[in-house]
Amino acid sequence: MKYTIPGPNVKLFGRAVQTLTKIGDEVYVIADDRTLSLKAFSASRSSYMCFSFERSFFSTSELESEGYRGKLSARSSLLAFRSVQTLDRTVEECVVELTGDQALVSLRFRRGLTKRFWLPLIEYEELQFSFRADSYVRSVCGQAKLLSDVLANFAVNVPEVTLRLSPDRLDVFTHLEGADTQRSVRTSVSVQAAELDDLQCRGDAAELTVCLRGLRAALGFHEGLTVRLQLDEPGMPLVGRLDGVPGLEATYVAATLAAGGRPLASSVAPHERRPARQCADTTSKRHRAFLLGLTRPPLDEFTSQLPRDEQVFAEASDDEEG
């Protein structure tokens, strides 16, 4: 598999990689005859984001009939797209080549300079993320910048926020439990329906509590895009879609706190090497936080899964033509 990304789209591709590394520790690469998809799952497998690039996004593409599936560590993926702010002005094109054991990323700069990054693949794990949003009757649509500005009012150490959608406005406020409500500062931000592109709320107002970190990362992908958030009852996943770039589809799905301790409606089913976690029937704060990806495993579990005997190789060459 070989894909050539034109200069104006390199920045978007790099932003997608950076966004996925904020969601999870691994980037899944899946290619077929129609799209190249990059996916990431949170450590607790309770949130998910996918960028699907259609063939029109690339200037050229060389495909294989059997498709491609691979997995990269997030840390190694960042090496090739570290300075995305200047990529559209300095890079003429980016070539991504996928082979059986590695991914080769070539950045061809102006004046003939080429940088190459060999990113080794790690063991692939088949994951299936299931969710359905076709029956949702509540949604809010607006500019990603507006919603990002709303989330910017919350401190980085706030783990969860609650979204309340009513027929006339969207409220976002800090989620607190138990005795914390007596001693903690609570932030609330309201957006009137007139400030949004679209607001649909059939029936009563709905409140959903989600992880702030993942939602902030998804909305921060590109402030110029339009985002639509679909909501349902507590325990049903929040589904977000970003639109505005031809040939690119971005989807974010996050689990929400279940009412009455019911299991979360969205789940990931790994293959037999990593059994699916069982949701205990408890409403403890730690249990809820684990389901939303808010509790962190030991530090060594967050390090890259790059094999110790393999390294990411980078090379720069001056291919300037006479």
Language-model segments: which ranges?
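DNA polymerase sliding clamps and clamp-related checkpoint/processivity subunits
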Residues: 1-21, 27-146, 152-153, 164-322
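Helix-loop-beta junctions that constitute the ligand-sensing/allosteric loops
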Residues: 158-160
